[in-house]
Design a protein with these regions (language model features):
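Short N-terminal micro-motifs specific to bacterial/archaeal maturation
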Residues: 27, 34, 69, 92-93
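Walker B motif beta-strand of ABC-family P-loop ATPases
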Residues: 60-62
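Walker B catalytic acidic pair
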Residues: 64-66
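Phosphate-coordinating catalytic segments in nucleotide- and nucleic-acid-processing enzymes
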Residues: 1-58, 123-162
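C-terminal lobe/lid and adjacent interdomain/linker elements of RecA-like ASCE P-loop ATPase modules
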Residues: 77-162
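Short, contiguous clusters of charged residues that form electrostatic/catalytic patches at enzyme active sites
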Residues: 41-44, 76, 80
C-alpha cells in the first residue's frame, strides 16, 4: 500500500521531533510540509497514518474530497488504497463531487466490498438521504447529472460543426 502512495508523493515523510515538523524527503532534499502542494501533503499524511499503524482494523477514516488538488491520473491509486484499507477493517467515509473518483470506486470494488453510496439533498429546509449499493442507481445523483449535461453539450457542439 505504501509503495503506491510513494508513487504519488515521490518520496517519504519524515518527522523532526526537535522542530515538531513534518517534511517530505525526495532523494537527498527535504521540504517542509507547508511548502508542499495541498494534494501531495494530503497523500503524505495518509502515508504517515498508514505507516504509524493509525489506519488499522477498527479505525475510522473521514476524508473530504480525496481527489481534490490531485493529478487525475492518481485517482485510481487513491481508490485502490481506500478499498485496501476497507478490506483490512478500516471504516471509510468519503465525500466527493467527482465523477471519475465515483466511477473508479464502482469499477474497482468487488462483490465482497461493503461500499454504499449516499446522496444528500436539502429541499425546503428538509434533508433527504438516499442510499444505494450502486452509484448509478441513486435517483438524485448530481455527479451523474453533471456528467450527462456535459455529454449533451459535447454532442450538441459536434452536431453544430457538421
Amino acid at each position: 500500500m505504501l509503495n503506491q502512495v510513494e508513487k504519488i508523493i515521490d518520496g517519504k515523510v519524515l518527522y523532526d521531533s526537535k522542530r515538531d515538523a513534518f517534511y517530505l524527503k525526495k532523494g537527498s532534499s527535504k521540504q517542509e510540509f507547508n511548502l508542499v502542494s495541498e494534494g501531495i501533503r494530503k497523500m503524505a499524511l495518509i502515508w504517515q497514518l498508514v505507516k504509524n499503524g493509525m489506519l488499522e482494523k477498527g479505525a475510522i477514516l473521514f476524508w473530504d474530497e480525496p481527489e481534490a488538488n490531485i493529478n487525475p491520473m492518481y485517482i485510481p491509486i487513491i481508490v485502490d488504497l481506500l478499498l485496501a484499507l476497507s478490506r483490512n477493517g478500516v471504516q471509510i467515509f468519503v465525500s466527493t463531487h467527482d465523477y471519475f473518483f465515483s466511477k473508479y470506486v464502482e469499477a474497482r470494488k468487488t462483490e465482497t466490498d461493503d461500499v454504499l453510496y449516499h446522496s444528500f439533498q436539502k429541499e425546503n429546509e428538509q434533508l433527504t438521504i438516499e442510499t444505494s449499493k450502486e452509484f448509478a442507481l441513486l435517483e438524485k445523483n448530481g455527479i451523474l447529472e453533471a456528467a450527462r449535461r456535459l455529454y449533451r453539450e459535447e454532442i450538441e457542439k459536434l452536431e453544430n460543426y457538421q
